[in-house]
């Protein structure tokens, strides 16, 4: 048993990326939605309580602090290794006992010298805040945010101040009074704001005139169940969108209705995106879809008009792919062909869809949380500088764009050692919308209580005036959590014999093959539901 535990740790160290977060924010109430400003270091978070918070962060300072702290800890660990105090130098990010990135223990109490500032906060919705997005129009990109809650109200607010500038009660347009909004999507070329519902309908409003506008378009029964995702297709038409719901993918024209609907996939379709190279080339032909059974499928309009999947990529057999997003990084072909996936086991996977496999794994959460197992990754965003942002209901992490050079070199050496025997073997994956109404006009006829609740509170802590050198050390978690093994991606199988490694200058333990690493891993999976939220 002791040997098996040691092998599991070795597996985690080999499979886990050395890239670490630069910032971690923990939430005292469940986090339901997240939005990253497309051009500035600004985050919007919506909670189950209906509160919306706006945080601004100094990314460069956080990167510098994280790098310096990591280097310091690495030197300390090397010294301890030389003195025999530790048996090995750990490369694992998730299993580190001394996290080197900045940690905010409570989103409501941000330390002054943390590199993060809360710009404003407000009680935006009476129920929970279900979705939040930034305005993507080129003429006003990021100037406004749209949020929707279980109170059935879509609100448009200034992203700088949080002040409401427009809103609409969508319940008046529900065919069934029991319906509710699940997802929002804004066109990148016009003022159409789409809202998907739990009963599978898509409602379209004019975002420039929310206060006085009526329903502009409606697509009834786009799906038999809740709309899980809406994706604009600007390269095809300003009125064409893809929607996911239950077990089908639909291609819709918001003016005319459903164009095509896929075959039943016998598996819930949860998330989708276009790859970076497709977006960069102005194409909307290939879409990647995350499934409830832990796979990512590839669909092409040019092949079968999105009627069925063409290829599937295995990601995590025992988890659902709850979120997927393109890297938005065109610096090299590898990143351009990759998408990030977040699963229900708290893991992050970078999938190269052209290679048809997982090429990088990170760990958002590896410990038991307040709501059950590991903090499930249900939210993914890319910040203004292509940093990955992952979030579950308990925490949010902004990941570094830089890889530790020394650790990266060590991993490269390990990879070279195993290249002869494991070059082609990898079972983790398989190849195959009138002017905006004024604030007074909108708010005057409402109850005074609503006005008080929805008034944003501005917090004066200008981040720009803070010196990078004044940042203090890294905060640490106080609560102890039970650690569980990470990267448990495949089921147990028969173990292979270990291959002998060539002698090097320094004694080195026998390297485990990829298949042996997989064989050491177990699975635990459960999908938790928050009813009526």
UniProtKB/Swiss-Prot annotation:
Residues 453-463, 521-533 have a biased composition (Basic and acidic residues). GO terms for cellular component: nucleolus. WD repeats lie at residues 26-67, 84-130, 176-215, 264-309, 372-409. It comes from the Eukaryota. Keywords: Nucleus, Repeat, WD repeat. InterPro entries: WD40/YVTN_repeat-like_dom_sf, WD40_repeat_dom_sf. One of its GO terms (biological process) is positive regulation of transcription by RNA polymerase I. Residues 408-428, 437-452 have a biased composition (Acidic residues). Residues 408-533 are annotated as: Disordered. The keyword Secreted does not apply. Its main location: nucleus. It is found in: Nucleus, Nucleolus. Belongs to the WD repeat WDR55 family. This is WD repeat-containing protein JIP5. It comes from Scheffersomyces stipitis (strain ATCC 58785 / CBS 6054 / NBRC 10063 / NRRL Y-11545).
